[in-house]
Amino acid sequence: MGRSTKGNGMSERIGVDYSELHRLDSPANRLIRESIWSRSDDIGQQSFATLGYFDEIIHRLGIAPHHRVLDIGSGTGGPGIYIAEKSGCRLVGVEVNEVGVEVSRGLVEGSGVGDRVEFLLGDAMQLPFDDASFDIAFSMNVMNVFEDKVALFREVLRVLTPGGRWAFLSGTFELGPDDADVRARLTPGYLIPQFYDSVDGYKAKLREAGFVVDEILEYISDFRVQVSRWGNAYSTHRDEIAKEQGEENTAYHIDYFAAYLEMVDAGKAANDLIISHRPG
């Protein structure tokens, strides 16, 4: 992710830019990732998603070699490359952050799938593709940065073939008027402004955009583990992270993960895989 203008779901930079997190080999990022992932599980993902999530997407969507697949908000490319390797599909990743695209292209060069995977710098609100260009689209934990989700979903619908499937993994929140303090603690921990939504909110917006909602899968146990690991990583390596991201942002993130964990335990936050399709 990165920086853009209000109206396409982004905003000007707040705190550290995603560029810092996209530099996977920086000293702080190496420490963070070693605290969260085992060597075999670290494919460059920058969310709470484990390899099991990606395997589930391949299985649930039936991704196969003949499919053309779009990865929206592809980050540093690891998940897209993993899915292409496991399924044999052709895949295009779109990412708005230049560093993310640069890292993605470096990873794909040594992956063995360079003939059927590419990563482009682009805006998901204005996808640089013709209508009906893809059979499947997916996104991993980036829906929260888009303010106008209906417009985003309509753009995804446009580039999907009739019957094409759209799946995204997203943190969902059920925050009420009594959760103002938690909301205030969550907001600074994000790198850019957040636009929370609930499962019901996502379902309504998908239908408004023209999708048919197929199924929603909620992840709790391993999601809680991942939130806890991210928080522990920031707390354990606070000094090293602060050298790269600044003391204030590091402190914000430590409190953010603590608040997030409280919401998970209270049943007010989850990670949901939401699957829908374009009619036709």
Provide a role label for each language-model segment.
Residues 1-38:
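N-terminal, positively charged/glycine-rich alpha-helical extensions of SAM-dependent methyltransferases
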Residues 70-72, 76-126:
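Class I SAM-dependent methyltransferase SAM/SAH-binding core
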Residues 125-136:
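A short acidic, Gly/Pro-enriched loop at the edge of an enzyme's catalytic core
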Residues 171-193:
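Short, glycine-/aromatic-enriched active-site segment of Class I SAM-dependent methyltransferases
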